[in-house]
């Protein structure tokens, strides 16, 4: 008799469709986990991108509810960067769905930094200081898939990616468009959506979590060279996780750089959660 797989709902980082993480998911499957994921947040008109992401959180809640109904039990909520934030908010607002939450390089913004972000957003200056300032100028098309691969292979943020993960990103993060001489390879994750997600980053997490405290354990895995951890700080993350923090060698995008090591770290982190046998 086979042992049933442990259900995970995984949420991707902004601009990277869930299928980009195929190598990671395959390794998690081999470790006894069944991963389900929304392919692209922000692209379903029923769940538009608005300030502080309430509809994106609701999309994750609705998706997770279906997984929980089928599994007959709460699930692990995992998320990378943006995905960690929506996972945490979903667990806070729908506590019966989450068994545990694992934040993958998703340092929680709180205190004076959150207040400052709120002021910047109110002054409509966020587009000049958020990652959206870069994403709104991102290249969106190439001659073909190989040209796209060569482009990203030489970008600093992608240079250390596992080659198989980069191939998956080209396969699932871009697609062919047009016919004949007009045929080209284009980004699948809408650049405008990516930028809007960055520019509507929640500044209300502190107050939301005070009103709706997360009732399940929360843990964190970060990259040793993560610029995001340094920018945001770790004070609120340490408070929420009660010190359940693990570091893995790599940048903010370490799941793409070292997917197999990341899968091992995820397994270790989840199995160390309180109440997990």
Task: Pin down the residues of each PLM region.
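Conserved hydrolase catalytic core segment
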Residues: 73-116
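Conserved HGGG/HGGXW glycine-rich cap/lid loop of the alpha/beta-hydrolase fold
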Residues: 3-47, 64
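Conserved serine/cysteine hydrolase catalytic core
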Residues: 164, 173-238
